[in-house]
Amino acid sequence: MNSIESSSNDSNEINKNSNKNNTHLNSNYNNIYKNNSTSSNNNNNHNNIEIIGIDNNKNNNKNNNDNNNNNNNIDKKRKDSKNKQNQEINQEMSENKKIYNSNDSNCSSGSSSGGHVNNGHHILIEENERLEHENQEIQEIYKQKGMEFQKKDLRFGYDVNSNNNNNNGGGSSSGSSSGGSDESASNQPIIRTRNREGSILNLKKQGLVKEISQRFQTPDTASYTRPNANNISIKDKISILKKEQERRKQDSEVQQREKVIVLSADSSNIQIYHPSVLIEKMNSKLDTEEKPATTTTTTTTTSTSISTSTPTTTTTTTTNTSTTNDITIKPKTSPTKNNEERSQSPITTPKQPVEEIVKKVSTPKSNNTSKKTSSDTTPTGKTTKKDKKDKKDKSRDSGNLVIVNNTNNTSSNNNNNNNNNNNNETIIKRRGRVLVTPSSDLKKNIQIYFTIPINPPVNKTNKPNQLLSNTSQQFLKTLISNEIPIDCKINDINDTDAFSDLSASASSSSFITKSSQSLLNVQSLRVKAIKTSFNILFLMPNQSKKILQVKGSDTIENLKERIISDYLFNNNSNNNNNNCKYGADSYLILDFNDNPMERSLVLNKSDYILDKRAQGLIPKLKVIEKSTILDSDPSDELSPSEYEIIRKLIPGTDTWRGEEVEYFRRVTSRLRYEALPLIKGSIQSTLLVRLSPLPIPIVGNKILISIFLPITQVTKTLDLELNETADQFTNRLFTKNYSKHLPNVNSNDFILKVVGSSDFIHGPHDIRTFESIRNHIIQGTKPQLTLIQRPKPELDPQPFKPRFDYPPELIIDHSCSNAINCNNNNTNSTNNNNINFDNWDQITHISIREIKKPFRVKVMGSTRIPLSCIKDIDSSSVIVSISLYHGIECFSKAFTQPIIPPPFAFLAETLSVDWCEWLVFTNIDYSNLPVDARLSISVYSANETVDDVEEIKNLDEATKKLTPIGWINVMITDFKYQLRQGMVELSLWPSDFSNPLGTCSNNPSSSQSVGLTLEFEEFNLPVLFPRKTKFSTSVSVIEQPPTNINSNEMREFFEQITALDPLSDLKQEKYNQLWTLRHYSILFPQVLPRLMLSVPWTQATAVDEAISLLDRWPKLKPYESLELLDAKHANRKVREFAVTCLEDLSEDELLDILLQLVQVLKYEPFHDSKLSRFLLRKAILNRNIGHSFFWYLKSDLHDSNLSERFGILLESYLYACGAHRIELLKQMEVINNLTEVAKKIKPLKDQDRREFMIKEFESLEWPKRFHLTLNPRFESNGLIINKSKYMDSKKLPLRLSFTNTDMNADPIEVIFKAGDDLRQDMLTLQMIRLMDKLWQKEGLDLKLSPYGCISTGDMIGMIEVVLNSETTAKIQKSEGGGAASAFKLDPLANWILQHNKSDMEYQKAVDTFILSCAGYCVATYVLGIGDRHNDNLMVTKGGRLFHIDFGHFLGNYKKKFGFKRERAPFVFTPDFCYVMGGKESFKFSQFVNYCCTAYNIVRKNAKLFMNLFAMMVSTGIPELQSMEDLNYLKESFSIELSDEKAREKFVALIHESLATKTTQLNNFFHHLAHA
């Protein structure tokens, strides 16, 4: 509170007080301007002085005369005390500087001088109202949680305990004045720090609130927000931004306080501001709610202390006896100072006269401030009610001051005193010294300041108007027409000539008119610039760029509607307007700091856009899909029980994390969302017919079909009419048996079902084309069907609950040469239609083609190296080798310097080595790097001393001089086509040299594996590889390829290339010639794989041209395109072209090669690829494909190299497959039960195994109904325990008999193996099945039996049992003679005759045997199947021969004591020939003819088999580890031979096999071993 004291009429007292007041006047002179100007710019600044108001009462006339007399006395003594005064002033300056600096840094937020009120008070009231609402919501939440709510006043600006803490508001030296202080302090606003303990955000973190109310969300979080890449939420980012703004605000305040004008007698040293600058800085918002100081007395209160932490309050009372032209200034003092220290000013300033200032201050306010002070105060100093009412009117006395510089100029000018006396102006004396008269320039500044209105209108902006730079002027000129030229050089603030026309006596109004005119021009330019249209650069979701012309009044929502409609329309390749259903709601707009822009935000109110425009830059915004910022975990799409099923089928899904994983999950989520309308239910999937693409078999006899009628419980046998369809057959059957008994039912209500299988026969298809019917016809058996009521397609629930709609995905395009102008949705606008994006402010990335320097990588160091890898502590060194590969081609190789670890490093358990060495690949630049290049890295130790890198290159990895430590492959790009930059931590795969075809993923056991740290070179922007589909026009390409080839030599060249097998290689000269003739090669589409191998991938222009050719290449046949998917072809575009060709495959054709397609997923560098999308979509839409897809992936899930990629694909399939996930869970439970039993019986003795196995089977709980994993068309409800047994072999497989849910069906016989790797059997049987289909397409049915086989896990799987069959070993033993029966001729013929009594049946069985024997002779020879003894060959009772147990293939025959046990090309023993009637019989000739025909048919499709084997190199099969293992196929297929030569070759092989005795001898020893 201000303590007021009445004036005294005693002249002595007046003179005393006047001198005392004048003592501080000069030192505080600059403080007046500094503090008040700072207060006008920032409402929260704290005043460092108190200004006691100017009194203009008539009662002070006498005091004025006394003051004049006293001033004359002081003038006489001035010269005597000059030196003393200078010392005192200097001391005051140094001490008060310290006080001022400390007070300025520690000042309180509340106003402590004269009751000044903060201008932000009205903002605090709004904040307090919002906090009251928040307080109520918090209290309700505590009630719901049953918790006690501790109420806290979170309001801003008011102290809750102000009544109890009176000292915080002010104090008084006497008891009589304390009451007034308490009353005023109780309502005084105090800025307080907001307590956030009870806030909504904090409650959410504690888990008490799941969702924040819309009222308390910021504009960014009110809509969808994208999670920050650094795991910082939008709310945290907003909080950080607010803190940053507050910090900048405080910095600006400090800078404003330091801006002062030099008050000096020498006008040349005075800093003169431009009038517009002065008006700009001084025309700030005034504190209209300030509490004024009284006119006669003042109480100064200090709320902070420098030396003590507890503030105390002191009050000093002075009486104003000066005239109306005088100003009394009271400085703030520290409570720890004594009275003498309190009289010192906070900042010492040069002594200068102030009479001109006094005149300017008193003149405009004399009429408004003439009030009686003596009547308004009491002797005790308390204020009256009238005084309280007039506080607001009196608050203007200390509000209008000018900015001045704070300088330490103590010089005086005696001439100023004479000038002041001549002009009859009052001279204020300080300590007996006349003050210096202000200079003319200073008077001009003061004159400008005091002519500003009391409450000038100001714009409510955070920042004052800034001066325009030359760049901004130029920017405005380009936007605004030349109606208002920018003539004012407003950035030249030091030009004093602008003030030369002004004199000290010039009126303020004339000057303000001129300065306002120049300022008006600037302001009008800015206003016009805001209203003028401007451009915004949008970065679209497909990485394309678009320019949109907008206005400042546009909102973000309007921009989004315009840009999205244009984006979807121009990217709709089919022009069918399918994209129209997706609106702007599917997208979000972000600024380039990844902050979401509020939908209702006006562009002129966006700080980001305004800042960019002020800098003359084009604003850049990002358009993203909403799905990209949502959580990629789709667990919310399923019920908890359904999600638990997925967790059981694929454990450990939560451990798969990372940016690429989250991106791939979003990709698969989009894919299943798009496929949702096409997903079929359970019944619909079951009713799908299975038609065979093979020719209809021709039989001489009638085809009989057995049908069971459940209603009448009768079995009927009908003849199949010629070309009769399934619907016609059903109608004939219904009419004959049911039409009379069921008059209200027609044949469409029934359907035929295969007994024992889930195959249905219906539709307008020839009944012989159904796969199940065709197999029965080929095998000569009678099909068994049942007539059932047609199942009604049940309303299956959706497989998942969609969370949002995905907009169409568009091709990524980083091309930025042209942009589409979206001005008013008119793409043909001539304004900015073709915009050059080469401007630096519009660059968002760097093209790899622009970096013209060698590629390099820095090897930092390696950790956790096992000591076992270091053979010799003294001489062994550790080396890192890095090779640059593209496919299987190595471009460059580099080595680090060998590092010998110091001896003390071996004291730890593991070893660490540091290189910090750049490896430069001098032969290839960044600009020529292939996008799919990879680094193959090896870390190994040299067992001998190695001096330099050249010696390392001479070492062979296969020698014993090198010990492998670990290896890994790293792509040079990431999944976004961005070049890797910065540090990369790698976890190596152990104990092997580099494998260029191996995985590119890290070892998941990173805590135990060897670590390697690399550093890739960093650039200022992301470095991207071009992904545009259209070929660059900068390269010369023949757009129209030649229509024919006139040169026979050229034609022969292409025919030779296409005739080569995929395993053969060409010389480099041939590849160069092929690339030279690339424009003609399009006439031979099959040459594409070789053409892609001839591309010089280290030449950027050649790569662009190859991609352009690929875009125009004719589509290949599906099987021909498989070669483009093996490891040799690494380019993504090439592999995507191959997948496009596979779209034409039928269901059965896709199932035939699905195993290979799943395996080549390992060759894909990243999770997301066109192949993975293709397979996932096919699996979702077809349950048969989905079943095989699931188990092919599940069987390799144990491999740590593949677990993440295969696991995410499985997870995505299970989310979309609906009820099929329940069936898969049942199958897995059955397999787990069988695996447990199979492992338990192995350590038991033979006599105990069966009894233990039966007990275990009886204790197991089987699902009520489940489909067999081996064949999902078979359905069972349990195990027939009495018929189950274990087999007498090394791995003890289980022979199991499952029940069939069909009443009249036979049991389902399978062999379950635990401990055998069935992947090789799967591959071999797949090839045999494929050969059988190829032969049947050519009309050759060789009666093969490619039984089913599937691997369900690590060394676990199932095999189908061929019923009514026996091994040739048992057949030979049944004839007697023991092991010698292996040399007998008739045992096999006698066994067939025994089961086919009649002559017709026997001849038919013999013919079947000849056909099947021919087929397996060709198949086993071509595939190089080994370990062929009489226990691996079986014959059915119908004479069908087949092979089992394919543990060796590709020519890997067994050896005994270093000798090959198998020397015959294939198994064809004399007893086989005996069944045919001998070598001279006609049937033997038939056999030879069948073999040669089958062999030539297979040779025509040799490329298919070679490609399928090549695609399986990465599976890890022991006998298929590298491409060299496939060399046997080149010999066995003999593609270079003609059909006649090949026929002669195979005839010779038949006779060679028949004459070789080692086969019979091998059978003999096998008999002995198993006797």
UniProtKB/Swiss-Prot annotation:
GO cellular component, one term: cytoplasm
Activation loop as annotated region, ranges: 1443-1469
UniProt protein name: Phosphatidylinositol 3-kinase 1
Organism of origin: Dictyostelium discoideum
Domain C2 PI3K-type: 851-1020
Keyword Metal-binding: no
Gene that specifies this protein: pikA
An annotated GO BP: response to bacterium
Reaction(s) this enzyme catalyzes, per UniProt: a 1,2-diacyl-sn-glycero-3-phospho-(1D-myo-inositol) + ATP = a 1,2-diacyl-sn-glycero-3-phospho-(1D-myo-inositol-3-phosphate) + ADP + H(+)
Transmembrane regions: none
SUPFAM superfamilies xref list: ARM repeat, C2 domain (Calcium/lipid-binding domain, CaLB), Protein kinase-like (PK-like), Ubiquitin-like
InterPro entries: ARM-type_fold, C2_domain_sf, Kinase-like_dom_sf, PI3/4_kinase_cat_dom, PI3/4_kinase_cat_sf, PI3/4_kinase_CS, PI3K-type_C2_dom, PI3K_ABD
